[in-house]
Amino acid sequence: MDNLDQNPVTARIGMVNFINTAPLYEKWQQLVKRPDWRITEAPPTTLNRMLYNNELDLGFVSSHEYAAHPHLYRLLRGLSISATGPVGSVFLFSKKDPEMLSGKTVLLSSLSQTSVSLVKIILEEYYQVIPNYMSGILTLDGKLPQCAQEKDIQAVLAIGDNALRLRESDLYTVKLDLSEVWQKKTGLPFVFAVWAVREEFCQKDPDSISQIQHQLLRCIEEGKRDLQSICQIVAPRIPMKEKDCFDYLCGMEYDLDANKLKALEVFFDYLIKRGEVPAEALPVKFV
């Protein structure tokens, strides 16, 4: 939903309203009163497309989106959606052990290209299997989409709120937290999303970028201090217990320190070697 109004728009900002962004999003709604900043809420893949098409000036996008079009963007320092170890909301749910998925059909969520690339790296590089992939979005109650109901789906990639719902069900015997696997293999956190700014906006309005970055960092700090009340607001959406929501959000990380930048570089190096993104994805460029 866009908060459209009569004020001249000085910045078009894309935000994800999943549970994992609640500490930022809920505090932004409460604290930031800038009608000249137009907020668009959407899943990561929609924000990816909008930023690419110049329908946004900056926003939370999949890490993969920056790497795919490095000539278009720069990153805001100190901001990400990351996890060190289990993330709790990016899973491969499978009826078989991952080693048994070669030639089997795996449904990939079309909500995040970063998670799609990560699960392919994990299956193909770490488990040495080549499944058959198809794309689709699970229903809110974790059921297969219409396009997949006639297929023999053996595993599904689920992210965000969908994954939080599905991890509590018994539909799949194997529940592989992709961030946890990544950390075991690389020793690094995983950076799922970044704040990317279009190059022309960097040139046009650096002052607005600085103000927006300040508010983002402020909201994240306020949100982390107020997790209990935020969980009271957002836990019923899944639904999940407030304590489970609190534990989940405590595991989310929103900074982009040196270790996370290293993790981003390792991920981008995989993508470059796999031919998914251009070599210009490295080194990472910042505002």
Predicted regions and their residues:
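Hydrophobic residues within well-ordered alpha-helices
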Residues: M50-Y52, A148-E150, L271
